[in-house]
Amino acid sequence: MKRGLLSGGAIAAALALGLGANAVDAAERWSMATAWAGGPILEQAAKRAARNIEFLTDNEIKIEVFPGGTMGSPLKVTETVRKGVTEIGHSWSGYDWGIEKTTVLFAGYAGGLNAEQMFHWIYEAGGLELYQQFRLEKFGVIAFPCGALPREMGMHSRKRVQTLEDFKGLKLRTAGAWAEIAPGLGASTVILPGAEVYPALERGVIDAIEWAHLSINKTIGFHKIAKYLIMPGIHQPTAFIECTVNKKAWDSLSERTQKLLMAAGKLTTHKFYQEVGNADAYAYDFYVNSGNEIVVLDDEVIEKAQELSYAWADKVAAEEGGWFAKVLKIQRDYQMAWSNAYKYRDTLPPK
């Protein structure tokens, strides 16, 4: 087996689901549209999802992965898949927030579930079924998680940002709900696809960007063109990446093969989360040694951001009702169920 596909534990997990690989004579050849052209790690996550699908289906399905922008807009992967331009896509559902804001509740947004809560909610508390029903009803695609990330690092910035005053007039690249929430802090927001983020920051078209994690951003090189690393990631407590499948292509598969695709997505989700979390633990010192300045936001900024995030979600729920109000209530009830977790999970930090 090629390194980086499936660990022994991952294969055991698939077998525990009652799934195995079964050779077939002819392969279905699929194309995968992705949102990623902003760094190799996210592209690797898409490729891992494709390889895991191939492995578990014993090559019943073969997938060619295309970089963001080569099979339609990188911010419109869902539409590319729905129309049948490609059979499958790998993206972040929050990019569809302009069509239906409920997407950010499943993708991760400021004030929402953190990574641990999201994992448990999706896989153990009915979140997955709700998410799939929503994506099919509103977007006409089959969807399942194909990657997950812990809290993002914050911002790479050409300007020092620590206080509420520092946010005033800050030109910030972002996406999803934060594009509407951050202006409450005084920032001016712009949405850019991954391929445009680095050159925009390099040329000073924008002052700061939020984009992923310490380890992922290290490979892109944002630290070379922006001196300041602003922490923590108040905008994104987690990010769940998804695979979307064209409905006609999905319906052509046997029930068993459909389950294998879902299993491949779950394996990819856990593996990617573990890889990024592990790499982040070692990436912090890299930035310090590279001469970057680490800036921790003042408590008043963090508190204000949380206040704005809750108010934003309440406003959208009141105005739009429907799916957004339904999912928001379910997630907030789940957050309350976790509100005492620190009492039985946390101890003093290591010295």
Language-model-detected regions and their locations in the chain:
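Intrinsically disordered, low-complexity polyampholyte segments enriched for Lys and acidic residues
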Residues: K2, N22-D25
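Bacterial N-terminal signal peptides
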Residues: G9-G20
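N-terminal secretory/targeting leader peptides
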Residues: A10, D25-M118, G127-K351
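Active-site-proximal, glycine-rich beta->alpha crossover segments in alpha/beta enzymes
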Residues: I122
